[in-house]
Amino acid sequence: MQAAYEVINERGYAATTFQEIAKRSGLSRPTLNYYFATREDLYHALLQQAHEVVTSCIRIAKQHDATLDRLRAYIDAVVAVWHRDGAVVGFLVNARLESYRHPGLPSATVAATRGFLGELVSEAVVRRELPSHTDQASLVELLYAMLWGMGAYAGWQRRPVDVAVIAKQLQMVIGDGLAPVTDRDR
């Protein structure tokens, strides 16, 4: 599976071949085909595994009460996954692009992340951590874009990147940007 993540991250879904995955993994192509009849089957298995990673990060975040604490916990959980297996996080970023290029591909990870952020923002409005006039849909999209952008940036660098430091900076930007609004509108 690791080789498949890496090849798809480098080449994209359309250019990925079983031959390249087999070569990279040290398996024969017939062995790969035994487990996955088609490239689509393999991609679905990778997506399922990546989706489990996303839902695990969301579960970790939901252990916290305050909005910013949840968001920070989610970011920290994704960074922890990055340190264990950057190819999975890179795949999550690429899966987002692939869902645009190939609308027939499933995008459950996108829906799960957006759903989590939507819940996060709507609960923040209910708890008055954000003002009642907050454009919730736009804020969800902004947060999603920031998280996705951080992952894309870290995943596509051709040099070492300290993802944890970048994540902390993102958390500071989000915290400093949201906290003053909360104080002002109470």
Task: Give residue ranges: language-model regions.
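Hydrophobic alpha-helical connector segments
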Residues: 45, 59-88, 136-143, 167, ...
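Hydrophobic alpha-helical bundle segments that form small-molecule/ligand-binding pockets
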Residues: 64, 112-139, 146, 177-185
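Hydrophobic alpha-helical segments that form the core
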Residues: 134-153, 165-173
